[in-house]
Amino acid sequence: MKHQLMIPSVLYTGVGSIAESIKEIIEKEQAKKVLVFTDQGIIGAGLLDLLLDPLKDHGTAYEIFSDLRPEPSYEDVEKIRRQAENSEGDLIVAFGGGSVMDAAKLVSILKGSDYSVKDLLANPSLGRKQMKSVAIPTTCGTGSEATCNAIVAVPEEEVKKGIVNTAMIPDYVILDAQVIKKLPKSIVAATGVDALAHVVECYTSKKATPLSNTYALAGAKLIFGNIREEIGRASCRERV
């Protein structure tokens, strides 16, 4: 029986790994200007400096796109797509939670294309990779950094819909537990439970494979062993 597993091309991990990893990626991709996708909550918490400081040290130009609300609509994504198209950036970096990463993933297949988000809702296979992307998640549980789908709201139908296209899988992912040190324990716990829901879903899926089950079981053990009272300890947060 044939099994398939789709994951990001390159994964960097480790506490404090953002600075060295992002410089390595920029040099590898020969990027001249980075388009940084984030939100006002991240900026207000002072977390974005973990990314901006190494960009400044490296002398890399960047532009910040932070006008993103939770669960953005397809219109919100089109707005930020137009803003990105007016920029000369050549690498996308998503620094945030699921909504930020989903928007960035969509722009990575929209920028400079002749199709819209509504076109992708009708026919996701239209999407083609337009820009390389880097995902730096700031919460434990969305999993958007590792998937080929993105969720957008469709206000006129009062629903949320998913767009699935393998071209949206980030080219690079940086997992740095230092990012979640400033998060309230309640947020870490809530997103940790979200992560647990994902591994349970993975294990019980009709499309589960021996390889995906291995990851799901390992993930469940890490979460169960670290999410309770010790969630405030940095070592436990890193495992979650």
Positions of predicted regions on the chain:
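An N-terminal, well-structured beta->alpha segment
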Residues: 1-64
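Catalytic cores of large soluble enzymes that bind and process phosphate-bearing ligands
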Residues: 10-14, 43, 69-72, 184, ...
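Local beta-strand N-terminus motif with an aromatic residue
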Residues: 31-33, 89, 170
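Conserved beta-strand elements of the Class I
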Residues: 35-36, 91-93, 134
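N-terminal small/polar loop signature for handling phosphorylated ligands or for N-terminal nucleophile
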Residues: 43-115, 229, 233-235
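A glycine/threonine-rich phosphate-anchoring loop and its flanking beta-alpha core
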Residues: 112-210, 219
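Active-site segments that bind and position negatively charged phosphate/pyrophosphate groups
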Residues: 202-237
